[in-house]
Amino acid sequence: MTKPAADASAVLTAEDTLVLASTATPVEMELIMGWLGQQRARHPDSKFDILKLPPRNAPPAALTALVEQLEPGFASSPQSGEDRSIVPVRVIWLPPADRSRAGKVAALLPGRDPYHPSQRQQRRILRTDPRRARVVAGESAKVSELRQQWRDTTVAEHKRDFAQFVSRRALLALARAEYQILGPQYKSPRLVKPEMLASARFRAGLDRIPGATVEDAGKMLDELSTGWSQVSVDLVSVLGRLASRGFDPEFDYDEYQVAAMRAALEAHPAVLLFSHRSYIDGVVVPVAMQDNRLPPVHMFGGINLSFGLMGPLMRRSGMIFIRRNIGNDPLYKYVLKEYVGYVVEKRFNLSWSIEGTRSRTGKMLPPKLGLMSYVADAYLDGRSDDILLQGVSICFDQLHEITEYAAYARGAEKTPEGLRWLYNFIKAQGERNFGKIYVRFPEAVSMRQYLGAPHGELTQDPAAKRLALQKMSFEVAWRILQATPVTATGLVSALLLTTRGTALTLDQLHHTLQDSLDYLERKQSPVSTSALRLRSREGVRAAADALSNGHPVTRVDSGREPVWYIAPDDEHAAAFYRNSVIHAFLETSIVELALAHAKHAEGDRVAAFWAQAMRLRDLLKFDFYFADSTAFRANIAQEMAWHQDWEDHLGVGGNEIDAMLYAKRPLMSDAMLRVFFEAYEIVADVLRDAPPDIGPEELTELALGLGRQFVAQGRVRSSEPVSTLLFATARQVAVDQELIAPAADLAERRVAFRRELRNILRDFDYVEQIARNQFVAREFKARQGRDRI
C-alpha cells in the first residue's frame, strides 16, 4: 500500500533493533506493522521489537516501557543491549498534489489539516489516494551512542531522563526524514525548549546569572520558539501574495545568484540580512525562499508585530518575536544569545533586517550589530565551522508607504501597529498596481574570513571583535547596495525633483534620461526592467504615468501634449524613490562637486580636488555607504578617466574646468546630493546661537521651524530638506565635527562649518547651471531635428 521514505533495509539489518513507532491513530499503527512485516520477511534472522513512542510531554509513567527497553540487562547480555539499534518510524501524510490557495487557507479550519488527517480521513485517503501515505524511518543509532551523547550534553542522571532524551532524538530524526520528502522549505528546529533546558552548557550559564531560574528561562524560550507547523509554512506564500497583491505576482530574481546561494547554503548555515524599505519585506524573504525551493529562514521581528491572529500564525511559520530594550534584563539577553547559538549549531538559517528598522528615506541605514554579535559569539565558540552572512536586496518599483514616510519627515508620529493598521495596510496594497518586486542575492560574506578561526584571538579582545563585526556588517551592506537595481521610478523622480515644480514633456523626459542610462550601462550597474524600458518614449511614458495622480507625480493633460511635474507637497514622497538610486551615482556626483571646488581653489588644484573629494566623503558618511579610502580614490580616478589628461586640464582651471563639466554626462550632483547639504546647512544655522549641548529633540524642532522659514524665503530650493529624517543624520554630522559639546572655540568652529556648507552649496549652484546649459542645448538640438521633419 505504501513505501517507506528511506531505504529501511539499511537500518533494520542489525541483529537486534528496537523500532519506536510514532503514531496518532490505529490506522497509522496498522501501516507501520505492515511495513515492519515486510522488514521481517526480508531479514528473518534479525530481531525486531516495536514500541509506541511516547508523545511529547508524556507523564513519567508513559516512559516506563521505554526505560525498560533501554536497560542494559533487558537484552540477553549487557553488551548486546548497548549495541541494540534504535530506529524511529512514523507515517507522514502528504497534501493533495493539486491543492489550491483556497485549500491552503482552509487547512487552518478544524479537521482540514492535510498533514494530520483524522482516522476517518486516513482510511478514505488509503482507499482513494494511497500515495499520500508514506512510512518514513529516521536515522538509526545504537543505545551506547545515545547514552554517550546524553552524558556529554545534559545534566540529567536518572534513567527516565535518558528515556526522554532518546524520545527527543527519535522525534528529531523523524523530522529530518520528513522534510527530506516534503522539501527543504519545511525544515525547522524542533524540541528547542526541552533540548536547551536539558543542556549542560545552558544550565551552567544560567547558574552564573543572579536570581535566574529554569522556569523563567523556559518561559522566555516559549516566547522565542516558533511553534512551527506545515500548514503555516504553506500559508507563507499565500499570505505573502496577499500582502503584496498590488505588485506583479512573480518576483524578479537573478537566477545565477539563486543558484550560487543554493550551493552555499548546502555547505554552511546562513544569516540572511535584508534591506528594509517596507513591512512587505518580512514576507518577501520567506516567499523568495519558497519560490526557489530553498531552506526556510527563521526571521526575527519586533514583538510589537505579535498581535491578533497574525502573531500565532507568523510564529508558526518561522517568525521569532523578540523584545525591545533588553539591556537591563541579563537573563533574557542570555536566553536569546543561547537560542541563536542553538539554532545556528543545528544548521538552521536566520534572517533579519541589517538596518534594524525600515528606512523611511529610501537609502540604506547603518547596520545594527545587536543580533549579529550573538551569531558571532556562537561562531567564535565553535558551534559552526563557518556562518555565511547572505545579503538580500529588496527593492520595489513603487510603495504605498511613502505617504506615511513623507508625513513622518514633516514631523508626524509613527502609526502604531495593530489589527486596524494591518487591515488598512493590506487594503492599500490592492488599490493600484505598484509594479515589480526585485530580489537580489549578492555573494555571501564568510564570518570565518572576517573573524578568523573559532576560539581565536577575538574571543579575548572585545574591541577588536567589535571592529571586525563593523567591517563585516558594512561589507554585507555594501554588497547589498551594489546588487540593488536602479529603477525607473527612482530615475524619473530624481529628474523631476530638479525642475522644482516645472513640468516636462515626454520628449524632455526621454532625452534627459538617456545620459543616466548611458552612464549606468558604462558602469555595468544593475538596472530593473522598468529602467531598461526608459530607452523608449513608450517606456518613459509608462513610468511617468505609473507615478501620476500624486504618486508622487502630477500629469497635466489640458494642453497640446501631456506634461509631468512634482508638486511641492509631493517632494518628500518623490525623494524616497530618488534616494533609492543615489548609490549608483554617488561617486560621480562627488567628482562634480570636487571639480567645482577646485575651480575656486588657490594653488594646486589637483590636490584641492582630491582633498575636497575626501572631505565630501567624510561629511556624507552618515548618510551613505562608501568603499574604503583606497578603493574610493581608485573609483574617483576611474570616474575621471572619461576625460583625457584630466589632471592637466584641472591644473589649468577656469574655462578648462567649465569644459570638463560641460562634457561630463550625466551631471547628477544637484539631483542626488543637494538636499542633504541643505539639511546640514539648516542645522548648522540653528547651531550658530544654540546651547553647546543642545539635545536632539530641541535641535530637530528648531531646524523644522527655521527650515520652513527658509522655504518661504526661497533660501532652500524646495521643502524636501526640511525633514526630521535628514536632520537626524545632520545632527550626527555635527557631533562628528565636535560641534555639540562645550569648547572654548565652539562658536568660531560652528560659524566656520556653516561657511563651509554654504561654499559647497555654491558649488552645487555652479554645477546646476552647467547642467541647465546642457539641457537647453539638448532641447535646441531636438527642436531643430523636429523642425527638419
Curated annotation (Swiss-Prot):
It is a peripheral membrane protein. The keyword Cell membrane applies. It is an enzyme of class 2 (transferase). Its main location: membrane. GO terms for biological process: CDP-diacylglycerol biosynthetic process. This is Glycerol-3-phosphate acyltransferase. It is found in: Cell membrane. A motif (HXXXXD motif) lies at residues 276-281. The gene is plsB. Transmembrane segments: none annotated. Pathway: Phospholipid metabolism; CDP-diacylglycerol biosynthesis; CDP-diacylglycerol from sn-glycerol 3-phosphate: step 1/3. Keywords: Acyltransferase, Cell membrane, Lipid biosynthesis, Lipid metabolism, Membrane, Phospholipid biosynthesis, Phospholipid metabolism, Transferase. Belongs to the GPAT/DAPAT family. It catalyses: sn-glycerol 3-phosphate + an acyl-CoA = a 1-acyl-sn-glycero-3-phosphate + CoA. InterPro entries: GPAT/DHAPAT (IPR022284), GPAT/DHAPAT_C (IPR045520), GPAT/DHAPAT_LPLAT (IPR041728), GPAT_PlsB (IPR028354), Plipid/glycerol_acylTrfase (IPR002123). NCBIfam families: PRK03355.1. The HXXXXD motif is essential for acyltransferase activity and may constitute the binding site for the phosphate moiety of the glycerol-3-phosphate. One of its GO terms (cellular component) is plasma membrane. GO terms for molecular function: glycerol-3-phosphate O-acyltransferase activity. The keyword Lipid biosynthesis applies. Its EC number is 2.3.1.15.
